[in-house]
Amino acid sequence: MLDIQQLRSNLQNIITRLAQRGYDFPVADFESLESQRKSVQTLTQTLQAKRNSASKQIGIARQRGEDVSLIMAEVANMGDELKQAENQLEAVQTRLQQLLLEIPNLPHDSVPAGKDENDNLEMRRWGTPKTFDFPVQDHASIGEHLKLIDFETAAKLSGARFSLLKGGLARLHRALAQFMLDTHTQENGYNEIYVPYLVNADCLRGTGQLPKFEQDLFAVRSGAQEEADNPDKTGPAGLHLIPTAEVPLTNIVRNTIVPLENLPLQFVAHTPCFRSEAGSYGRDTRGLIRQHQFDKVELVQITHPEKSHEALESLVGHAEKILQKLELPYRVMLLCTGDMGFSAAKTYDIEVWLPAQQAYREISSCSNCEAFQARRMQARFRKGQEKPELLHTLNGSGLAVGRTLVAILENYQNEDGSITIPEILRAYMGGIERIGL
C-alpha cells in the first residue's frame, strides 16, 4: 500500500510513475474522498473543540453555583452531532483505505519503462543450451513414455491442470525439493519454516493478493464450522489455500516490531501452491508448466530499508545457485514497469532453457516490495527506543519444483527415452543415475 501522505503531497508524480505500469490512477475518486475527509474531519474537530469548551464552562459554572442545565443540553446535542460526524469520517476513511488497497506499488527508479514482457531487459546468461543428435521430446511426452506422469487419472480425480507423478519421477520431485531446502538452509543462511497451507484474509491483504486478485485464489468452505464461526453471515470465514508460501512467510512479521539487531530475517518453506489460473485460458494446457497445484520452495527476506536492493541481488543469486548446481542453462531478466507484479517495486525473473520449446521459460521470480507490503501489514522495526519504521520485504522462488522437474526431463533426456539424473541429485536418489523403462 502506498503512503497516503505521499499521495496527498505528491499526487501528480505518483500518477505519472504508476502510468508507467499501465495503471490509470482514479484521480476523481481519490480527490472526491479527500475532499469529503477534509470537510468531515474539520467538522469533527470543530465539534470536539466546542464540546471541550462547553465542558469547561460547565465546570466553572458549577463552581460558582450557577444553573448549567442549558449548557448541559447544548453539550448533549453536540455529542449526538459529534458521533454522527465521527461515523461519517470513519466511513470515508474506510472507502479511502479500500481505494488504496487496489493501487499497485511504485516502480523503483532502476526499473526500465515498458509495456509488457517484450520490453524486459536481459541481464545475463549462464550455461550453454545442449545440442541433441536425436529428435527432442517435450517433458509431457517423456513422462508419459516412461509411464511416470499420468494426466488422465489426475483429470478423473480433480479435473484439468492437475497431474499424477509416479515412481522414479515422484521420487525425483521429492529429491529436488529436499536439495533446494538443504542448499538454502546450509549454504545461504535461511531459516526453514513449516507453514499453514490455509490462511486468512488479513494475510492475503498483507501481501497484496486481496482484494484485487481474489479470482486467482481457491477459497475454502468449512460447512457447519463456518456457520458456527460466522452465524450472522456478515462475510466469508476467510480461509484460502495459499497461492505461494510468500503469503504465510511474509505475514510472520505482520503487526510486529522487529528489533533492528534481529535483521535481516531469512525464511524458506517448501509448500504446495494453489492457483485458479483465471487469466491463463488456453496457455500451457499440456504438461506441468501451468497447474492448479504445484510445489515451490519459497525464499523471503525481511530487511532494513537501506539494505533491501542489495538483498534483492543476493536473493537472485541464491535462486541462480540451484540452477548452476543442476547445470541447467538459464538467463536473468529485469522486468519492465508494465510486466511487474502488483506488490513489486523491482523484479528479476530467472528463465530456464527448455529444449522442446527452444525457449527460456520462467522458473523463478524475485521481487523487492520495499515498504508496500509492510505498510499493509504494519510490519516495522525499531532501533533502541527510537520511533518504529516500516520494514522492507522481498520474496522469490528458489525454485518452482515442478518447472525444475520439467527442465531436467527435457535437458537430461536420452535417445532411448530415459532420463539421466543430475549428479548433484544422485545422493538424494539413493545413487540412481538414470530413470528409464
From Swiss-Prot:
CDD domains: SerRS_core. L-serine binds at T244, A245, E246, E298, S397. One of its GO terms (cellular component) is cytoplasm. Belongs to the class-II aminoacyl-tRNA synthetase family. Type-1 seryl-tRNA synthetase subfamily. NCBIfam families: serS (TIGR00414). The keyword Aminoacyl-tRNA synthetase applies. Coiled coil: none annotated. Pathway: Aminoacyl-tRNA biosynthesis; selenocysteinyl-tRNA(Sec) biosynthesis; L-seryl-tRNA(Sec) from L-serine and tRNA(Sec): step 1/1. InterPro entries: aa-tRNA-synt_IIb, aa-tRNA-synth_II, aa-tRNA-synth_II/BPL/LPL, Ser-tRNA-ligase_type_1, Ser-tRNA-synth_1_N, SerRS_1_N_sf, SerRS_core, tRNA-bd_arm. It comes from Nitrosomonas europaea (strain ATCC 19718 / CIP 103999 / KCTC 2705 / NBRC 14298). Keywords: Aminoacyl-tRNA synthetase, ATP-binding, Cytoplasm, Ligase, Nucleotide-binding, Protein biosynthesis. The keyword Signal does not apply. This is Serine--tRNA ligase. GO terms for molecular function: ATP binding; serine-tRNA ligase activity. ATP binds at R275, S276, E277, E362, I363, S364, S365. Its EC number is 6.1.1.11. GO terms for biological process: selenocysteine biosynthetic process; seryl-tRNA aminoacylation. Consists of two distinct domains, a catalytic core and a N-terminal extension that is involved in tRNA binding.
